[in-house]
């Protein structure tokens, strides 16, 4: 048997219950709304074009023809260069992903030139010295099907 009185001495005394004021529910609701307003938004903005602080801003008065792609590498508009045209090579995956999404949306909207615009844009993002990759032996073989415990209906 243990020493019951020593056990009682080590425990902290119980706190008395505090009375809740009448407007406590209002205060709880306000703190809940504050929590919602402080929460960071879920949307994220991804910059595709690199921002170089050392280069000057593009001239506002000069007109650039974006459809032909003539002004993208010009010194007049240094911040308007496309991906991969700067001094450092950056990953191009976000740009290609956005272009493919845009291409998938255009036929639904009724754009007649949607099929024509994609190959021209894709050729701009490829490096001039590299040829398109040949399909390797791993890509030629069909993918192995996943064996599921239940048959698919």
UniProtKB/Swiss-Prot annotation:
Region called Disordered, residue ranges: 1-24, 65-94, 125-153
Coiled coil stretches, renumbered: none
Membrane-crossing residue ranges in chain numbering: none
Lineage: Eukaryota, Metazoa, Chordata, Craniata, Vertebrata
Biased composition (Basic residues): 1-15, 144-153
Tissue: Preferentially expressed in the testis.
Entries under Pfam families matching the protein: Bclt
Low complexity composition bias: residue spans: 67-78
Protein name (record): Uncharacterized protein C20orf144
Organism: Homo sapiens (Human)
PANTHER family found in the cross-reference section: RIKEN CDNA 1700003F12 GENE
């Amino acid at each position: 048997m243990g020493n019951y009185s020593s056990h009682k001495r080590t425990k902290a005394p119980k706190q008395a219950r505090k009375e809740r004021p009448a407007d406590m529910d209002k205060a709880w609701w306000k703190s809940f709304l504050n929590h919602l307003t402080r929460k960071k938004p879920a949307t994220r903005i991804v910059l595709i074009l690199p921002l170089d602080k050392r280069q000057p801003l593009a001239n506002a008065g000069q007109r650039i023809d974006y459809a032909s792609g003539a002004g993208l590498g010009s010194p007049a508009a240094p911040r308007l260069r496309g991906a991969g045209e700067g001094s450092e090579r950056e990953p191009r995956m976000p740009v290609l992903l956005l272009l493919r999404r845009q291409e998938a949306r255009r036929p639904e909207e009724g754009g007649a030139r949607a099929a024509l615009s994609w190959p021209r844009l894709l050729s701009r993002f490829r490096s001039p010295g590299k040829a398109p990759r040949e399909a390797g032996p791993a890509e030629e073989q069909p993918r192995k099907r996943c064996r599921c415990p239940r048959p698919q209906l």
